[in-house]
Amino acid sequence: MKPFEYGDEEIGSREIGFAVSSTIIGIGALSMPRDIANQTLFSDGWIILLLGGLICAVLGWFVTRVAILFPKQNFVQYTSAHLTKPVAYTISSILVLTFAALTAYESRMISVISQTYLFSDTPIQLLSFFFLLVVIYGIAGSRAALLRLNVLFLPIVLIAIVLLSLLNINLMEINNLLPAFQTKVSQYAVGVKNSIFTFIGFEVALFYAVLLNNKTAKKAPMAVAKAVMVNVLSYILIYVTCISVFTYMTTRGLTYPTIELGKEIEIGGGFLERFDAIFFTTWIITIYNTTAMYYDVASLLFCAMFPKVKKQIFIFISAPIIFMVNMIPSSLNTLSSYGTYLAWIDMGCVVLAPLLVLIVYKIKRRNGGNETPS
């Protein structure tokens, strides 16, 4: 059966903004309040979330701005033209492996959490296998359709976040948020560095910019920055709710505080006692989007390096490898460490490569007068 494909395979700035926001909201948001609470005192974590988010918004704006300098050129093409082909292929190969590994990481994490909260009797291997199958089905077809799917799913997730806070309002204690500004300045610096990884996902704009239509391409950098800030506000809301309901000391001891918030909700005197199951089921949607985006970017880069290889061939060869890789970590701590390493590699490549491209591009423009990229 031939997969359906859009005739234009183009997207606008709105779609790329939704894609960025959907990619950022993932597994990390479930443990984010604990990670931030371990870096700060009381409710001070909102400050490092805001600062880290602003930095990522600027980085997202920057990488997208660089990408749109080369309309209808993919990442491999313009990095090859400005950084030489060997350098471009080396960076792209590292990114393909990183995004494929992130796909494995997300698949394993969602399987572990699903087993903990929903499917206690189902083996992790089966959960991971079926989740990966659904991801493969999603990315095997139209790339534009996959990106437009974020426009449908993201509002549902954002509504779930707002409901999570509103339905816990009767359990909130303002005193749990006080006193304010008790964290040392040096600890803020460490916290901001760690909080930046919370908003990783903006880099997908660097690779999907090739699909932007000419009418809205110039709006894309600001759309990406706004998308990151939507996540910042959502995360601050989740964090403040966790601290006000649990206290910051209790939040530090919870593995997934965001899900635990759902467990505290009761509607109508026991009418709805498992809101956490509904919330987590909704959250699987955005984790699916995150995983699909990373896997699709890996296929996009690989096929850009080797144009004769079709996307479907890459997927069906790499999928079994990804499944085997996601079974390697023996514990949750090991898995989390892998996630941190991948985040460092991801962040380093997607910031350094566009920066070098921009420097070389400016030098060429200066030497070549009013030369513009083809």
UniProtKB/Swiss-Prot annotation:
GO terms for cellular component: membrane. It is found in: Membrane. GO terms for biological process: spore germination. It comes from the Bacteria. The chain crosses the membrane at residues 16-36, 44-64, 86-106, 122-142, 149-169, 192-212, 227-247, 279-301, 313-333, 341-361. Its main location: membrane. InterPro entries: Spore_GerAB. Keywords: Germination, Membrane, Transmembrane, Transmembrane helix, Transport. It is a multi-pass membrane protein. Pfam families: Spore_permease. Contributes to the L-alanine germination response. Belongs to the amino acid-polyamine-organocation (APC) superfamily. Spore germination protein (SGP) (TC 2.A.3.9) family. This is Spore germination protein GerLB.
